[in-house]
Amino acid sequence: KVEMSPLVHTRMLYVRDHVRQNVEQILYFSRLGAAHKDCYFEPILILETCREAVEDNLSLLEEAQFSVTYSGNDCNVISNKKGFMFILGQIISNSVKYAVKDTAPAIQFSVTDNPESGQITLSVSDNGTGIPASDLPFVFDKGFTGDAGSFLSRSTGMGLYLVQKMAKDLAIDLQITSQLSCGTTIILMFPKV
């Protein structure tokens, strides 16, 4: 680091994190068909874990000049932290990948706790390119890139597919809403325990 310029060091961290995410995707994909899945469930704080995921992806977010905000009260849920971190990493990666150039890219993590229903949700919203309404029903399908695939060569159609598979393993319900040119929100609904 001493012999590198700050710009080269920042770019090197960006490439390192990008490679790490690709390797994680490959490893999670290879585990999909496993008969026995090694999942340790424990109490985790949602926003604290979101902050850890942001820290793990900080070079990607800084390179794209993202602002990150958090709202709501931190809530305990029972989940597998490693799997939840993977989900968050993929969502962050997509937000960076589909950020609109020449804007102030932003991502927000918002926790809602409904005491009446016992439902705890995490909404992760960005102000990126958004997803066409015609593509929304297919974004969790394996290999689906939609319109994004035609203009972004890095699109593999695997990120949200793996997010959906991991969420299913963790009993987290997923919803996605998006408006073209306005951004995307992914909502994670944690099981009641």
Q: Each predicted region: which residue ranges?
A:
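Conserved micro-motifs of the catalytic ATP-binding
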Residues: 34-39, 76-80
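Short alpha-helical segment of the dimerization/phosphotransfer core of two-component systems
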Residues: 14-19
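Short helix-loop "hinge" at the ATP-lid/N-box region of the Bergerat-fold HATPase_c
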Residues: 95-99
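Acidic ATP/Mg2+-coordinating residue in the GHKL
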Residues: 126
